[in-house]
Amino acid sequence: SKAFDGDYKTDGYNQVMTTMDEFNKITQIMYDEGYVMVNLYDLADIDENGKMQAKQVYLPKGKTPFILSQDDVCYYHSQDGDGIATKLVIDEEGKVRNEYVQDDGSTVVGDYDVVPLIDRFVEEHPDFAYHGHKGIVALTGYNGILGYRTDISYQTRPDDLNDDKKAWLDAHPDFDLDIERAEAKKVADAMKAEGWTFASHTWGHKNMSTVSMERLETDTQNFKENIDPLIGGTDIIIFAFGADINNGGEYTGNEKFEYLKSQGYDYYCNVDSNQYFVQMTDEYFRMGRRNVDGYRMYYNPDMLADLFDVSQVFDPSRPTPVPPMNGG
């Protein structure tokens, strides 16, 4: 496969990605087991007094709610040629699909990533989506969003513009930032109408546990200026690297939290790999996430056993052993 072609990116894809075949099998198994997609706003919401309040989810007996989320839905330059879609588009029927560039340079439109795959599945199985609610799409901004080059840096071309962006701009001399942003907003609007929610994954994929306050503030403003207008704003932050701003205790008094809260963020999600972790105060709703990827399936199938049997879904095209993290 193109993702597992032995280049320097192969190990990373093997560790932190899920193949289409795996994803489709997982979706079918979880549906068959009675899982139903809900969103964060189904679980808790800010009341008229500005306080976070728990809500009730009503499902038929035998059904289990879960939240689906996908990070980095930006179609980075670094992924070109690796068997990954290039952008999300709207087809002639008004459905959200992917554009994919084939080896000969021609483009095809189809369902090659989480959003259109779930959309097609829910068309056939509407009871998989509670009130039509689907997953959360977490966005960075440094290469733009949803495959559109929406960041201001593509227009201003600062001195520190990286080689990926320079090469893309050289190949697209007719680039127009306003057109890219308008197209991205059109797709984002269509996704929201289909039940998708957007979250910040930080503009620059920053590790929020280690980043300085100054960098955090700059990054947050970059997100607000470049992405919020396209997605209608968001009050959810899904931490890049899964790295939280503290080690599990309440956020109250945490300088980074106080700043993010002041910027309108009410929902915070890390990656802790537990079956579930929820923490709620008047000020925020916090939830852990589980990574369903090559690393977790290969090394810790037991940590996913309540969702699906890894032996039924693990893609034989994956090189094994899956490389350990940090080369360890």
Residue ranges and their predicted role:
Residues S1-G6, T10, G50-M52, L59-F66, ...:
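Metal-dependent polysaccharide deacetylase catalytic core of the NodB/CE4 family, i.e.
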